[in-house]
A protein has these predicted regions:
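Conserved alpha/beta catalytic core and glycan-binding cleft of carbohydrate-active enzymes
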Residues: 1-88, 121, 127, 131, ...
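Short, contiguous acidic/charged loop-to-helix segments that flank catalytic cores in large enzymes
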Residues: 45-52, 97-107
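Active-site His/acidic residue clusters
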Residues: 86-98
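Catalytic cores of secreted or luminal carbohydrate-active enzymes
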Residues: 99-128
């Protein structure tokens, strides 16, 4: 866990651009993969446990995908791809690790992405500009949990996540 730079508010607010003009993402050819950062920079309880890293990737994916607006997933993000972005050059070919799907922790991450994307597809009213959105996703909410609350068309949901490395 790293509170620095963890404010997710820019996924939804802070732009004069019309809704849907900005694409939210957590990794790209310019942004290091979050799974690689967990492996190389994480606290020992995270970087030494594939299960912990994949659970954190699932949490990050849920928060990315549950904020309204268009999203981009980068090459194999849904599998917890933890190869450094400079492998073969930033925009070069990356090794494909289909065997990741044979690992139960990575398969669970993949399935979590599928579930979240299905939720988005089945409930489009939550993810358009008319939804009522409340985000508690800044760096100040690092220790007490981040939340996303969305209401639309008489329905609502709340996503709560502990990004800290403790169980608090």
């Amino acid at each position: 866990g790293n509170a620095s730079g963890s404010d997710l508010g820019g996924l939804w607010t802070g732009s004069a651009m019309p809704f849907g003009s900005l694409v939210g993402f957590s990794e790209s050819h310019d942004e290091e993969r979050t799974a690689y950062k967990s492996l190389s920079e994480g606290v020992s309880s995270v970087k030494n446990s594939l299960k912990a890293r994949m659970q954190r990737e699932s949490l990050c994916g849920a928060f990315l995908l549950c904020v309204p607006g268009p999203k981009m997933l980068w090459q194999f993000q849904e599998l917890g791809y933890d190869v450094i972005i400079d492998e073969g050059g930033r925009t070069g070919r990356k090794p494909v690790h289909w065997e990741y799907l044979d690992d139960p922790d990575r398969k669970r991450l993949h399935d979590d992405y599928r579930t979240i994307l299905k939720f988005r597809n089945d409930n489009p009213e939550f993810f358009d500009e008319s939804a009522s959105v409340s985000l508690k996703v800044g760096t100040s909410s690092w220790n007490n949990g981040k939340t996303i609350s969305i209401s639309a068309s008489g329905k609502s949901f709340i996503l709560v996540g502990n990004f800290n490395t403790s169980d608090s």
